[in-house]
Amino acid sequence: MVEQNKALVRRWFDEVLTRGEVRLVDELFAPNYVLHDPGFAYEVRGRDGIKRFAATFRAASPDVRFAVEDQIAEGDVVVTRWTARGTHRGAFLEIPPTDNQRTVTGIEFDRVVDGKIDEAWVSYHLFTEGTLDPERVKRAFNMIHDAFPDLRVAQADKVAEKDKVAFRWMMSGTHEGEFMGVAPTGTRVAVMGMDIVRVGDGEILDYWGEFDVMGMLRQLGITPPLERADN
């Protein structure tokens, strides 16, 4: 069953998002589907909502191609790590078109019920930094802890398969130090993030992580919220 669920979710990336076959949404998704995308101020709901979401994404980058880098599945949940590449020709989120080639990385948790994608959570990075060595990872975590000294992370979901484990989590804290050039505001923020780790011999061998940087900046008053994606 998990392999069937993986194949179902892969069709979303390969056939709908990459090829633009939006008509397949009715076949792949449950009628009451919900997408929790932190890039939008509201949840995307229903088949019509996800059709508009896919159309918006492809309008921003008509030549977009999604590559499924990895999938992990357990029970009714499929976790997909993906990379999207395309030319930025239309506005997407708060970013106006640049006509530049853009690469976006992301992780998505999809829950499958009765052979349909019923609910999803996605986190992505619009400004991909590539591979970080251990020292840069330490600096990144130190920056976050310095900016949010009371930081708390709560696990929301966990999926494991073979030597990989995926986590979905919520992070909260008070902005008391500089963060990405933003002076302390005293604002309490809460954002979603996702990690995938590969383990061996009691150690973490590889780590892939995404969290809602845009949502955090929005809560700090840096960017305006977007309009509903399902209106």
Residue positions per predicted region:
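C-terminal and inter-domain tail/linker signature
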Residues: 1-231
